[in-house]
A protein has these predicted regions:
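Beta/alpha (TIM)-barrel catalytic core signal, keyed to glycine-rich beta->alpha loops juxtaposed to Asp/Glu
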Residues: 128-321
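Conserved beta-strand positions
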Residues: 18, 51, 79, 116-119, ...
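Active-site mouth loops of central-metabolism enzymes
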Residues: 21-32, 84-96, 120, 125
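N-terminal binding-site loop/beta-alpha segment at the start of enzyme catalytic domains
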Residues: 1-76, 140
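Short, acidic/polar
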Residues: 29-41, 93-109, 158-162
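Active-site groove signature of glycoside hydrolases
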Residues: 106-127
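A short, structured active-site edge motif that brings together acidic residues
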Residues: 73-86, 175-179
Length: 321
């Protein structure tokens, strides 16, 4: 594992962030299995963990594991809250929701602060003023060290930071959109923001110019880049991955990128998801990809991707042929 430092956080962050949104991490009957997976991830060097208020028992499982292992002082927690607009979620986008959900999350996580606090979704009809004010209060109280937005557009992030600068406050210093070699053809949850695709080039340029840390989710396109199915038809997609990523990503442009990733992986003697991660890490955006491997081999493969070097030409070819 490789590590990096971020201003305002006095411990190293792992180059890869461990995502905890899957059913394997929801506690209950899965709790012991989740602890074993977390132990393997820790041994592999993961120190940054992504969770959210909307992950239900996931926060409790992560908090219990960190406490039982005595790891909290070394771990970096990225927590998310306030999730308006997602299908099945009735969160109200307000300063009150931000505070109430963070404080509930802190109790579940068995901690008095999180290093990174990310607003899960946005409601562009609501002015950013009160939200920025509340986040600054939470930072002043020591409950968050840095904050930002997940599914927030560039325009709304800039609006938040413009308000903060005009009022002598701290603005967003981190974002967490989706990003991978392939791009959405269907928004899975509603209100999602991704960096992939030509339309998002201005956002990528802005993030690169400002070198704002980006903790990108769906870095393997929810399994579309897992290598479980083959574009030559020998392993049909419908038999190998869930229907959701098929609906979200399966289109000719993405099939072509996956086919090129398969070819390059074969040439380099590695796995397709390693090519996808290596491509991400070659981008000029200041990325911390979120991954969720749940087996020893997959955990090892993800970490090994950090050592895989791609040339500019290879990265361009993967994207555009």
């Amino acid at each position: 594992m490789k590590y990096r430092m971020l201003e305002g956080i006095d411990k190293p962050l792992s180059a890869l962030t461990y995502g905890t949104s899957g059913p394997a991490f929801m506690g209950g009957e899965y709790r012991d299995a989740a602890f074993r997976i977390y132990d393997l991830a820790w041994e592999a060097g993961f120190r940054t963990y992504d969770t959210a208020h909307s992950y239900g028992a996931g926060e409790e499982t992560l908090g219990a594991w960190l406490s039982s292992r005595g790891h909290r002082s070394e771990a970096v927690i990225l927590d998310k809250g306030c999730n308006p607009g997602q299908k099945g979620c009735d969160d109200v986008f307000s300063a009150q929701t931000v505070r109430e959900q963070l404080e509930e999350s802190l109790r579940k996580l068995q901690t008095d602060h999180v290093e990174l606090y990310i607003l899960h979704r946005d409601d562009p009809s609501v002015p950013v003023d009160a939200i920025v004010e509340e986040l600054n209060l939470l930072k002043k109280e020591g409950k968050v060290l840095r904050f930002g937005g997940s599914n927030w557009t560039m325009e709304r992030v800039i609006a938040a930071n413009t308000y903060a600068e005009a009022h002598g406050l701290t603005g967003f210093t981190v974002v967490s959109p989706a990003y991978s070699l392939v791009e959405y053809i269907h928004d899975p949850w509603g209100g999602s923001v991704a960096l992939s695709g030509a339309a998002q080039q201005p956002y990528r340029d802005w993030l690169t110019q400002n070198q704002m840390p980006v903790f990108c989710y769906s870095s393997s396109a929810r399994g579309y880049l897992s290598g479980k199915f083959r574009t030559d038809g020998t392993k049909p997609i419908e038999e190998c991955i869930r229907p959701e990523p098929i609906m979200e990503y399966d289109a000719p442009v993405n099939r072509a990128r996956l086919q090129r990733a398969e070819k390059l992986a074969a040439e380099k003697g590695c796995q397709v998801p390693q090519i996808g991660l290596a491509w991400l890490l070659h981008q000029p955006v200041n990325l911390f990809p979120i991954v969720s491997p749940t087996s020893p081999d997959h955990i090892t493969d993800n970490v090994k991707a950090l050592e895989l070097s791609l040339s500019d030409e290879e990265c361009s070819w993967l994207l555009d042929g």
